[in-house]
Amino acid sequence: MAKKELERRSYAFEIRAEETDQGKIITGRPIVYNSRTDLGWFDEIIESGALDNTDLTDVRFLVNHDTSKIPLARSRRNTPNSTMQLTTDAMGMAIRVSLDTENNFEARNLYSAVERGDITGMSFMFSIDGEEWENLESDHPTRRITAIGTVVEVSACTFPAYDATEINARSKEALDSARLAVETARSAENKRSVETDLEVLRLKTMIKIKTGGIKNA
């Protein structure tokens, strides 16, 4: 079976720094249901329940998706002793990250940046198991994600929002991926349309043969 392509999404939903009896904590919500995001080539909405059967076996917590750095936390099967706790609810997904600020200077830097408001958003990397497209014939269709296959990584994000004013900050890779998604969906829709037309023609021909409209050779 072909490996599913991983995608990234970033949002400006609140991320917080808290000091508790258990130490320095980061909380946030990387995935929010029913929020429309403009990805350049199309709008995208993550539908309620898209996380119901998602694989959350091993999820890492990074800063700006930098995989060259050691993860600042990790959720392994979301066990109680994991340094990142994941919660799925009616709103989407929330996280609670326990940072080792005593032994990791990057964890200290992140905590300070979130506390000061220098880092204000969350991002996540995921694969898609189910999707529905609307208005594919338009210049700006909508994709509704109905099932997220797996989440492999969550990041604190410096540029959290894909607002129109920030479109130039998007990577070419991200825009190319969005364009390809639209083209693939349109191609699949056209193929289904052709197959439907052929099936209708076949049924009409069979009816004519049975009613004597066409003579068998």
Language-model region placement:
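Signature of dsDNA virion morphogenesis modules
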Residues: M1-L180, R186, R192
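Charged/polar low-complexity intrinsically disordered segments, enriched in acidic residues
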Residues: S171-A217
